[in-house]
Amino acid sequence: MKEKGLIFDIQSFSVHDGPGCRTSVFFIGCPLQCKWCANPESWTKKKHIMVAENVCKWKNGCRSCINACSHDSIKFSEDGKLKISWDTCEKCETFDCVNMCPNNALKQCVKEYTVDELMTILKRDFNNWGSDGGVTFTGGDPLMHHEFLVEVLKKCYDSQIHKAIETSGYAKQEVFLEVLKYIDFAFIDVKNMDREKHKQGTGVYNDLILSNIEALKKSNWNGRLVLRQPTIAGYNDSDENAYKLIEFMNKNSLYEINLLKFHRLGETKWNQLGKEYEYSKYGDMTNEKMEHLQQLYLDNNIACYIGDNTPF
C-alpha cells in the first residue's frame, strides 16, 4: 500500500474522544475554516511550520533558522519579530530550519505515515485501551484522507480495534458513506442550522453536512452517532437554533448531542501561524446558558451532554 496519511499529532490515553481510553490520530487538512478553531495548523494539507516566539532566542543573536532556510522564507521584522513568508515556506520539503533550531522554537506541523507505520502505533497502544477503548480519527478532518483512512480502518477491523471518528461531515456523499461503514462510533459537528450563519463562521454552507447525516441514517449503518456543537455566544447559542436542530434530529431519529463550551485554547496556535484570532476577546458561554440549552434538548427526549460530562 503506497498511500500515505498526513498526520499532525497522535495522542495516547485520550479519554474524551469516544468510549473508554483511546488513541487519537489527528489528520491534517480540513474543508472548513472555523473562526474559533482550536487546531488552525490542521487547515491545509501542505506541510508547514509553527513558530513559538516566546522561546525564540533571536534577541541573543541566534540566526540558526535564517541561515538554514534555503527558500529565504524567514526574516526578522523591524519590530524584532520572526516573520515567515508562508507562500515559499509551504514549498519546503526538508524543514532544515526546524532541525537546526537549538531552542525548539520551530515545529513541523505534519508527518507522513504509511498504513503499516500507523498500525504499529495502534497495536502498541492496544493493551492500554481496556475493553471499551480504541482509536479515534480526528483532525482537521480525516475524510480528507479517505483512501488512506479506509485502508487503516480495514486493518483495524481485522485486528478487532474499535473505531471512532470526529468529522465535519463535509465530503462527497459516496466518500462519507464509504468511510462511515467501517466506523463504530461517530461525532459529527453541526455548527449552525442557519446556512448563511454556518458559512459565515466556517467558510462553507451546511447543506452537504445535513444531507450526509440524513443519508447515513437511511443507510444500514449500525454504529452510534452523536452530534456535536461548539457553542458560541452570539453565533449558535439561540433557542431558535436549538429548536431547528431538535427538529432535524427528531426527523432523522437522532437522540444524542454533545454541546462543547467555547474556549480559546487554540489562540496561541493562531499566533504561531501568523494568523489573527478574532475570537480573542469574544464573550464566554455561561454555565447557566449551557444548562438552559441542555434542558431544551432534554425536554424533547434528546440526550444532551455538556463538555466532558458524557456517558462515553
Curated annotation (Swiss-Prot):
PROSITE patterns cross-referenced by the UniProt entry: 4FE4S_FER_2 (PS51379), RADICAL_ACTIVATING (PS01087), RADICAL_SAM (PS51918)
Domain Radical SAM core stretches: 16-299
Lineage start: Bacteria, Bacillati, Bacillota, Clostridia, Eubacteriales
Annotated positions binding [4Fe-4S] cluster 1: 30, 34, 37
Similarity section: Belongs to the organic radical-activating enzymes family.
Gene name of this polypeptide: csdA
Catalytic reaction annotation: glycyl-[protein] + reduced [flavodoxin] + S-adenosyl-L-methionine = glycin-2-yl radical-[protein] + semiquinone [flavodoxin] + 5'-deoxyadenosine + L-methionine + H(+)
Cofactor notes: Binds 2 [4Fe-4S] clusters. One cluster is coordinated with 3 cysteines and an exchangeable S-adenosyl-L-methionine.
Name of the protein: 4-hydroxyphenylacetate decarboxylase activating enzyme
Protein source organism: Clostridium scatologenes
